[in-house]
Regions:
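Structured-RNA-binding interfaces characteristic of tRNA pseudouridine synthases
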Residues: 1-261
């Protein structure tokens, strides 16, 4: 038996999320990958992913593993999969790893990036990958609000409504808000995230950037442990799973270069 790790990228616009769903609920990343891998390995395949992205959310660097008794060389998997999965999903890399390596146990953290088009006029060329916010955002206030979320907290306030039970205590290591013209990004690194947590962070920071909420109220929102005290969840299309960190060194490199930590 062999254990294979694959790196996957996908445009989530037309997908029903990462996690496999009943057939009548649309294509999923997990379902498509398992179908394709079963074809090229000539046996049923079950994959395990590091992050369960929602419907409409994208990924540049999703990590999955699967075990197989098949003989296909790992380096041939990305090319072999092209014929068996939708064009919205691409296997970037495949490597053989120790049998005991599991994606949820052997990672140090994740980075998500939320993208906003901040201009009165929409951009039809990138609308699949951003949230269009028409009114000007105060980037400095958004960064100040993000700084209030750093550290280890109970993030119940920022979890999705009707989400499955999970430990709400998470650690946010870095938040960086940046604007280049009308292109605004909210980058977040943490040890793990609750359902809808990053999208709720984006929605909260946008409310601050628009003057609807105050930086000094952020700690109070967290202390309330109540989803109802914050606004709407930011739309899915602006969110992308940017990277999953296998090593502490790689995570620290990103934190130093992008987050100045």
């Amino acid at each position: 038996m062999r254990n294979i790790r694959i790196i996957v990228a996908y445009d989530g616009t037309d997908l029903a999320g990462y996690q496999k769903q009943p057939n009548d609920k649309g294509l999923t990343v997990q379902g498509c990958l398992e179908y394709g891998l079963s074809k090229i390995c000539n046996e049923p395949i079950q994959i395990y992913g590091a992050s369960r992205t929602d419907a409409g959310v994208h990924a540049k660097f999703q990590v999955c593993t699967f075990q197989t008794s098949g003989s296909i060389p790992a380096e041939n998997i990305p090319r072999a999969m092209i014929a068996h999965i939708p064009k919205d999903i691409v296997v970037l890399e495949a490597v053989e790893i120790p049998l005991d390596w599991k994606p949820r146990w052997n990672i140090y953290g994740k980075e998500y990036v939320y993208t906003i088009h901040n201009q009165l006029i929409a951009n039809p060329l990138t609308k699949r990958y951003h949230w269009h916010v028409k009114k000007p955002l105060n980037i400095d206030l958004m960064q100040a609000a993000g700084n209030e979320l750093l550290g280890t907290h109970d993030f119940t306030t920022l979890k999705g409504t009707n989400s499955t039970p999970a430990d709400p205590v998470k650690t946010i290591i870095g938040i960086h808000v940046e604007a280049e013209g009308s292109h605004v990004t909210i980058s977040v690194v943490g040890d793990g995230f609750l359902y809808h947590m990053v999208r709720n962070i984006a929605g909260l920071l946008v409310d601050v950037g628009l003057g609807r909420r105050k930086v000094e109220d952020i700690k109070g929102y967290l202390a309330a442990k109540d989803r109802r005290v914050i606004g709407k969840t930011a739309p899915a299309q602006g969110l992308c799973l940017e990277e999953i960190f296998f090593t502490e060194e790689r995570q620290q490199e990103v934190l130093q270069n992008k987050y100045s930590i």
